[in-house]
Structure formats: structure tokens, C-alpha cells
């Protein structure tokens, strides 16, 4: 199995978590618990294990069975791998018991590079796209039965594709001929026949493949649930770092951070500043990859990491 994967913003993500006040606090009796929401190929997890004390514990999650098999090779008693989405991490830890959480929302290089996974329009393979190959419909199965209006909605909403209607119409037309796309290259060719204008440096199929991957794996729904679960699990003073790779993800993270970093007071209500309820989060900042990292790993170019810290006295 190809396990080569270069994690994005590796040093920055680890620093963002371990520089939080809880982990920096020197207390021999305290057992640090950190969650890596997407194990991938273990880059962030391994870096966290190297940076934390021997008494610490790192819990990683992943839906991908290939990632789980890689994780099971790690021989470190401080490490636990969970075959589940980070959306459900609050089922595996108690409220306010975690000292730091990292969510890396990017698809891993092996997932893209291994043709049989069906994520890449550049490699011939079955049109699968499922992170967890034990669950749900493949992209091909869904395209074979979804109404044209639903295909249009998915491609437009999750791919921000302006030719969504034309692409969906072409897919359904092929389906009616008994030629519904079954492979990655069949779908990519079909999209290319419809999308006549291409953005600089971008394949015509890029947005459609992104849309189907996000939809098939419920990525945005998982992100929304995961952010809520993270806020519940973090101790006051603990940090949450989220690395996103496209505007849909980043918008959700940004809006979540902003919504929980301010306190809504009814207009006209006389409240003194010292009596204001405490907001849940303090926004620490955002980080983008350096030019050097992008030159060494072009897949990092669209990444952005946002970091927030749970306030002392914040509501659970």
C-alpha cells in the first residue's frame, strides 16, 4: 500500500495546539489528551506524539479503512485509533476532558493517487469516492438513480460549478442510453464535453469531482457536527485547530468561530460589561502555508488553518 502523504501545516498545527495554556502548564499529575480528527496517514498524529509527554494520550479518528490499517502499525501505548468520523468524537470522550483538537479536512494523497478509490479524474478507476467503503452508495450508484434536479443541486452547491445544470443533463442523457458513467475517466470525459471554458490551471472535472466527494461522504454535515462536538469536549483553555482546503469548509469554520466568539445581547437591555455572559471561544488567528511549503507540496496551496481557544467559564 502506498502510504506516502505529506501533511499540510504540520509544524504550525502542532505548535498551535501545544502552545495552548493547558498543555504548556507544567503539572505532573495532569494527563494530557489530544484528538486528531483525521488520521489520514498519521503525519499530524505522529508529530503530536513526539511533541507530548509520555503521560499524554492521542486519540485519532478516520472513516477510511486504509487509514485504519496504517494506524494499527503504530506501536505506542499512548495512541488510540477509532474507526469512525470525527463528527461522533463526543461519543468517545467526556465533556471538557480534552486539551486540544486538530481537524485536518483535506483528502490524503494516497486516496487521490490510488485509482481504485475513485477520487481522481486523472486516473482510470471505479467511480467510488467513499471514504468508508463499507457504507453507503458509490458515486456511480448514486448518479445512476438520482433525479437530474438533485444532481444539479449537488454539483452547484458543493462544487460551486456554474455549468451544473448542463453537466447533470448530460449525465442523465447518458444514463437513459444505458451509459451512466461507471469510471472516473468516463465521468471526467463527459464533464469535459460540457464545460467548454476551463479555469487557468484547473481541469474541467475538478469542481464536479469535489462536489460528488463532499456529498457522498457528507463532509460538510460531518464538519458541522464535529465543530459542535469539539466545543463540547474541550476543556476551558484548550485549543481547536481546523485546516480546510476550499471555501465551503473554511466558511463553515469561520462562521462557527465567529458565532461562538461573540455574545448576543438583546437590543436596549441595560447590561454592564462586567455582567455580560462569557462567549465560548477566543479566536487566536489563521495561518496559511509558506511559499516554501507550497513549492514543495503544491496540494497545500489552498489550505488555511483557523485556531480558537475555549474560554474559561465558557458554557458546555
From Swiss-Prot:
Gene3D superfamilies: Putative methyltransferase TM0872, insert domain, Vaccinia Virus protein VP39. Keywords: Cytoplasm, Methyltransferase, rRNA processing, S-adenosyl-L-methionine, Transferase. It catalyses: cytidine(1402) in 16S rRNA + S-adenosyl-L-methionine = N(4)-methylcytidine(1402) in 16S rRNA + S-adenosyl-L-homocysteine + H(+). It is found in: Cytoplasm. One of its GO terms (molecular function) is rRNA (cytosine-N4-)-methyltransferase activity. Its EC number is 2.1.1.199. S-adenosyl-L-methionine binds at residues 42-44, 62, 86, 104, 111. GO terms for biological process: rRNA base methylation. One of its GO terms (cellular component) is cytoplasm. NCBIfam families: 16S rRNA (cytosine(1402)-N(4))-methyltransferase RsmH (TIGR00006). Specifically methylates the N4 position of cytidine in position 1402 (C1402) of 16S rRNA. Belongs to the methyltransferase superfamily. RsmH family. This is Ribosomal RNA small subunit methyltransferase H. It comes from Polynucleobacter asymbioticus (strain DSM 18221 / CIP 109841 / QLW-P1DMWA-1) (Polynucleobacter necessarius subsp. asymbioticus).
Amino acid at each position: 500500500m502506498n502510504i506516502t502523504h505529506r501533511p499540510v501545516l504540520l509544524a504550525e498545527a502542532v505548535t498551535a495546539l501545544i502552545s495552548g495554556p493547558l498543555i504548556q502548564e507544567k503539572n505532573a499529575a495532569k494527563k494530557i489528551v489530544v484528538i486528531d480528527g483525521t488520521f489520514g496517514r498519521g503525519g499530524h498524529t505522529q508529530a503530536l506524539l513526539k511533541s507530548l509527554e509520555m503521560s499524554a494520550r492521542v486519540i485519532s479518528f478516520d472513516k477510511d479503512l486504509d487509514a485504519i490499517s496504517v494506524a494499527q502499525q503504530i506501536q505506542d501505548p499512548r495512541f488510540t485509533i477509532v474507526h469512525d468520523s470525527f463528527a461522533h468524537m463526543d461519543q468517545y470522550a467526556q465533556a471538557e476532558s480534552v486539551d486540544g483538537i486538530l481537524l485536518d479536512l483535506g483528502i490524503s494523497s494516497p486516496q487521490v493517487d490510488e485509482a481504485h478509490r475513485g477520487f481522481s479524474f486523472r486516473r482510470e478507476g471505479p467511480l467510488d469516492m467513499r471514504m468508508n467503503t463499507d457504507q453507503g452508495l458509490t458515486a456511480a450508484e448514486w448518479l445512476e438513480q438520482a433525479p437530474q434536479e438533485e444532481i444539479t443541486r449537488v454539483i452547484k452547491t458543493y462544487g460551486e460549478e456554474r455549468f451544473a445544470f448542463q453537466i447533470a443533463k448530460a449525465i442523465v442523457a447518458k444514463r437513459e442510453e444505458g451509459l451512466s458513467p461507471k469510471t472516473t475517466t468516463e465521468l471526467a470525459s463527459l464533464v469535459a464535453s460540457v464545460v467548454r471554458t476551463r479555469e487557468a490551471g484547473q481541469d474541467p472535472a475538478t469542481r464536479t469531482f469535489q462536489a460528488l466527494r463532499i456529498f457522498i461522504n457528507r463532509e460538510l454535515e460531518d464538519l458541522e457536527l464535529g465543530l459542535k462536538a469539539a466545543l463540547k469536549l474541550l476543556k476551558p483553555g484548550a485549543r481547536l485547530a481546523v485546516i480546510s482546503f476550499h471555501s465551503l469548509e473554511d466558511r463553515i469554520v469561520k462562521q462557527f468561530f465567529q458565532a461562538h466568539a461573540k455574545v448576543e445581547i438583546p437590543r436596549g437591555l441595560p447590561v454592564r460589561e462586567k455582567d455580560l455572559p462569557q462567549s465560548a471561544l477566543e479566536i487566536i488567528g489563521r495561518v496559511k502555508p509558506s511559499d516554501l511549503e507550497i513549492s514543495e507540496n503544491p496540494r497545500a496551496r489552498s489550505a488555511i488553518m483557523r485556531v480558537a481557544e475555549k474560554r474559561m467559564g465558557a458554557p458546555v
